[in-house]
Amino acid sequence: MKELFLFSDMIMHSHTFNYLFHLILVAIIVLIVAKLATRSMQLVPRGSQNLLEAYLEGIVSMGRDVMGSDELARKYLPLVATIGLIVLTSNVIGIIPGFEAPSSSLNLTLCLALSVFLYYNFEGIRTQGIIKYFAHFMGPNKILAPLMFPIEIVSHLSRIVSLSFRLFGNIKGDDLFLMVVLSLAPWVAPLPAFALLTFMALLQTFIFMILTYVYLAGAVVVSEEH
C-alpha cells in the first residue's frame, strides 16, 4: 500500500523527524490556543475564552465526580487539562491530510503514561507518607499481605502499559483505517470516516483524562477502612 503524503517529508524523510515535527507542531498549537484564550480575559467570557472555560469546567466536573472533592478536582486541573489538550491535539491532527498523529507513536503515549504514573505515586506518598501509602498495597488482611503486595505492585505497573498502549493502539488503528479509506475512495468515503475518527479522538482523550483522575483519587483520597 502506498504511503500517504506528509508535509514533514518535504523537509526530511525520516520516521524520527516526522514524529518530532508533529510533536513540536502540537506543542505550538496548544500554546497558541492557551494564549488566544487568555489574551484578553473578561468577566463575561466570549469567543475562545468561553470555549476554554467550558472545557475547564467540564474537567472540574469530571474530577469532582471521580475524586468526590471540588478542591482536589481543581488542584489537579492543570495537569489533567494540559494532558487533555496535548492528547486531543495529537489525535485530531492525524485526521488532517498531510499530517500524522504523534499519539500514534508509542514514544508519546508511553511518556504521558509514565508522567501520570510517577506523579500520582508522588502525590500519594506526599499526602499519606511513604509507609502508609505502601501499606495500602498489602490489603486489609495482614495474613494475605505477602501475596497482595506483589499483586498490587504488578497491578500499578500494568497501568503504564494499559494507558500507553490503549491510546497508541487506537490512534494507530485509526491512522491505518484512514489510510485504507483514502486509498479506496479518496473523495467520497472519507467524509463519514473523518466524523468517526474525530469521535474516537475525543473518546480517547476523555478516557485518558478520567483515568488520570481515577489514579490520583486512588493515591490521595484516604479510605476510612484503611
From Swiss-Prot:
The chain crosses the membrane at residues 17-37, 79-99, 105-125, 168-188, 200-222. Pfam families: ATP-synt_A (PF00119). The keyword DNA damage does not apply. PROSITE patterns: ATPASE_A. GO terms for cellular component: plasma membrane; proton-transporting ATP synthase complex. One of its GO terms (molecular function) is proton-transporting ATP synthase activity, rotational mechanism. One of its GO terms (biological process) is proton motive force-driven plasma membrane ATP synthesis. F-type ATPases have 2 components, CF(1) - the catalytic core - and CF(0) - the membrane proton channel. CF(1) has five subunits: alpha(3), beta(3), gamma(1), delta(1), epsilon(1). CF(0) has three main subunits: a(1), b(2) and c(9-12). The alpha and beta chains form an alternating ring which encloses part of the gamma chain. CF(1) is attached to CF(0) by a central stalk formed by the gamma and epsilon chains, while a peripheral stalk is formed by the delta and b chains. NCBIfam families: ATP_synt_6_or_A, PRK05815.2-3. This is ATP synthase subunit a. It comes from Campylobacter fetus subsp. fetus (strain 82-40).
